[in-house]
């Protein structure tokens, strides 16, 4: 893909994200600058938003929760996340190419 926020390192996918916690539903929103914006329902308290983000991404990419690693931004809305060997690309990413 020609989107700046998607990079591959071997079989792993690296994503630069901006997170919107306390949303009404979990979803990919779109691009915000060079970051992918994701809305999740969990509040940004006691790591709940990070745990929920990992659960959401693991379902979207069809990988185990342990295959989602937040490399940077544990205490920030701006994150760098590694998806180890994603089994499936979410439908949302197809719309980024259009």
Swiss-Prot record:
SUPFAM superfamilies: YggU-like. It comes from the Bacteria. InterPro entries: DUF167, YggU-like_sf. GO terms for cellular component: cytoplasm. Pfam families: DUF167 (PF02594). Gene3D superfamilies: YggU-like (3.30.1200.10). Belongs to the UPF0235 family. HAMAP family: UPF0235 (MF_00634). PANTHER family: UPF0235 PROTEIN C15ORF40. This is UPF0235 protein Ping_3043. It comes from Psychromonas ingrahamii (strain DSM 17664 / CCUG 51855 / 37).
């Amino acid at each position: 893909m020609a989107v700046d926020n998607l990079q591959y390192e071997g079989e792993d996918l690296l994503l630069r994200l901006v997170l919107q916690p306390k949303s009404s539903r979990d979803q990919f929103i779109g691009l915000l600058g060079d970051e992918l914006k994701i809305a999740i329902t969990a509040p940004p308290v006691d790591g709940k938003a990070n745990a929920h983000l990992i659960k959401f991404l693991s379902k979207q990419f069809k990988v185990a929760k342990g295959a989602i690693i937040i490399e940077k931004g544990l205490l920030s809305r701006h994150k760098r996340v590694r998806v180890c060997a994603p089994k499936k690309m979410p439908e949302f990413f197809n719309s980024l190419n259009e």
